Every structure is written in structure tokens, then in C-alpha cells.
Amino acid sequence: MQRKDFVSIVTKGVKVNISLHWWAALLGLALAIGLILRKLNTTYALMLGAVVGCVIGGATLSQTVDIVVSGTQSVMGTVVRVLAAGVLAGVMMESGVANRIAQTIVVTFGEKLAIFALALATMVICAVGVFIPVAVLIVAPIAIEVGSKMHVSKLALLVALSGGGKAGNIISPNPNTIAAASGFDIQPSAVMVSSFIPALFGLGMAVLLATLVQHRGQVVTMDDLNGGENASAKSGGKASRELPSIGRAMVAPAIAVVLLLINPLGSVLGIKALTMFQVDAMYILPFAAIVGLLAMGQGRRILDYTKAGIARMIDMVMILIGAGALGGLITSSDLPDQIVRLITAAGVPGALLAPIAGILMAAATASTSTGVILGASSFGETILAFGTTPVAAAVTMQAGATVIDALPHGNYFHVSAKSMNMSIGERLGVLPFEALIGLTMTVVAVVLNIVF
């Protein structure tokens, strides 16, 4: 497979033909990572890396603007869907729905299956549209209470919570799934359905690892609740208020899941009437949230919850814009070609480029969503040129992005550490187990979507 000698960039009708050096893209990426590690705002770090990479790669100032603008325009579809998902996220987090679901799952399974229940609770909460850091904050107080009674270590509890969250994250209508779907021009529901079995394997691995290490490390106590700074209230604001019943709490997520699955299930079952239902997640997620809110009798709170939801999405949207800019730099260079040559020379099948890109980009940015959008925007065309289907590419890239995405230069590392009152050293000890969980999901995703 050969690449053209130039890259065509179209911005507002202006076409610029330019090819940047691969090393300039790497330097821009390295600069962005370095600035993130130095605690510069992630969006600015990504954009500055893109600008510097373009300039040193041979682009003029005008061409640099075109590259950056073109890159950011490429993620606008994702941005719109993420903002729409904010309505559902606001309702799930602020109304007490997520708290009720978590409590119900843990109470149902009891102490004998406590580790499984905690992992499953985090998985389900993520799967219905709650961000993984918030899901961990919601379940952490319950985990600490149960763990202190059973003398379970902090390590085991966070492995269960983080692993369950990772499993739920790849089958959720969260930004990472939306980014993976948009990057390969498919519906988020297709990614969610195809990621379900890998997610189950991830859940199983999380429970297995947490069970094996439940007596390793410092045992959690009720005093550790203070380390989360009232995490329950912070994550949902419903600690001191009456939670909705489980029946009413399930209305919003149930409607969202059912409507999202109609089209892909129709394709699988060969039912033409179902395949004709092609309503985008941009409509489904806010609709499900509003219906769920009315079912709970909290319709009057819609302005408060939507405001809270979009506030939680703003940071993610800004990061996506920065990632789009950096993606514009990479796609305007011959870096994808160089990586393809390297993979070919090493004898690695080209079909594995999707999960490899997910792993590397997520590690670089310490973010699943940012890793996916960078991987898709930078290597999407190259991946598809190897014959990988869009669904397989999206699913395996997203799974790969869960392997080493929880590094110290990202927000999740510190939020999850605080939820369990862990030191930095203790939190670092969780990383190998998180990587094993993510790797398990990646291998299963590759086997199901690429090998067979």
C-alpha cells in the first residue's frame, strides 16, 4: 500500500497540498505529552503540540492553521454526540439513579459475592452512561464499607472497581464509544454490541484478579471514607436525599439501551423493519434521559440536571478538539506510512494496527477517549486499507485503549486513588492488573472481530 506524495487538506473550500515529515509529527506528539505531564491544560498541550509539529515539519503559518482547523473539524460529529450524551449523564449522576443501581446490585448478591457485585455494579453504571471516574466514586463508599467488614485490601477493591468500569466503558454510550464509532463512520450501537463479549471477559478477569489479591496490601477501613471527600455526594449529590426506586431508576438507561440496540439487532437477526430504525444517538440519549426523569417525577429538575451534565462534558469536548488538532498533524505527515512499514517489517499483521494504535495513543494521553480519537483520526484510513472492517477497527481500537490508559499524567489515576485513600505508590501497584484486564478485552475483541 502506497500513500500519495502529498496530503490534501480542505478547509472552508481552501485546498492545501502538503506532506509533513514523520519525525515532526512524533516531536509534536512528544511535546504534547511532555506538556500534559507538566500539568498544562490538556487541550492547550495537544494544540500546541500540533502547531509546533506543523511548523518544524515544513508547513507555513497559513498551512498550519488549515491543518489544525481541518483536524478539529474532523471531530465535530463526535463533539455533537458527546454533548447530547451529557443530558443522559446529568440525569444518571445527579438524580441518584447510579447510586440506586449500585446499591441494588451489591445488596442483591450479598457479601459472599461482594467482589463480583462491586465489579458488576461499576460495570453497569458505566454501561448506562456514567463516566468511569464518577462510577468509581459512586461505588467506592459501598466498596469500603463492605471491604472493611470482610478485611479486603484496597488493591483488590480498586482492581474490581476499575476493571468493572473498563468493561462497562466499552459497551456504553460514553465519549470513548462515540469517538470510536464516529472515527470509522458507524453507529455507537454497533460498537456497543460487538464489544459486549470482550466486556464480559474483562469483568471476569477483574473479578479473578481482585479475588487473588484480596489479602495483599493494606486492608481498607471505614477511616478511608474520608479520603474520598464525601465521594457519594460529589458523584451524585444524593447521599442525604431519597433515592428513586430501582424500577424508576432503570427507565432512562433501559430506554437508551433498547433504542440503541434496535438497528444492530435487526442486522444480526435479519429483520428489515428493525434495520430501518436509524435514529442517531444524538436523539436517543437526550430522549431517554427526559423520559426517565419524568418517570421519576423529577421533571422540574431538568434544567439543573442538563446544566450539570453539560458541565461534565465541557472538559471532554475541549480535549476532543485538541486531539483533533493533533490528529490533523499526524494525518498530514507520513507517520502512518512509517508505522505501517515498521509493522510490516516486524511481521505483524496489518489488522493489528487498530488495537496497537489504541494502546499507544491512550498511553500517550492517559485517556481512553483521547486515545481513541487520536488513533482513529491518525490511522483510520490506513487501518481500513488493510481490509479491516469499520466495526472491527472501532471495537479493537477502543479495547486497546483500555490497556494502559490509567497512567499518572491523566485525571483518572488520581481520582481513583483518592476514592480509596491510596498513596501514589499504592495506586501504581494497581496499573499492572488494570493492564491485564484491558489486554484481556483487547485479545478477545481481536479474536472475535478480526481472526474470525
Indicate residue ranges for each PLM-predicted region.
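Long, contiguous bundles of hydrophobic transmembrane helices that form the permeation core
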Residues: D5, T11-A25, L29, I56-G57, ...
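Membrane-core helix-loop-helix motifs of multi-pass transport proteins
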Residues: V16, I144-A249, T389, Y412-L448, ...
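Membrane-interfacial loop-to-helix junctions in multi-pass transporters
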Residues: L20-W23, Q73-T78, I105-L120, G147-L157, ...
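Short helix-coil transition sites and intra-membrane helix breaks within transmembrane domains
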Residues: R38-T42, M76-T78, A89-N99, C126-I138, ...
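Core transmembrane alpha-helical segments of multi-pass membrane transporters/permeases
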Residues: Y44, D66-N99, F116, M123-V124, ...
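Hydrophobic alpha-helical transmembrane segments of multi-pass integral membrane proteins
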Residues: L83-A84, T108-I142, I321-A323, A346-F386, ...
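Re-entrant/interfacial helical elements at transmembrane boundaries that shape
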Residues: V87, R100-A102, P133-V146, N174-F184, ...
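Alpha-helical transmembrane segments of multi-pass membrane proteins
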Residues: K112-I125, M150-I170, V191-S194, L200, ...
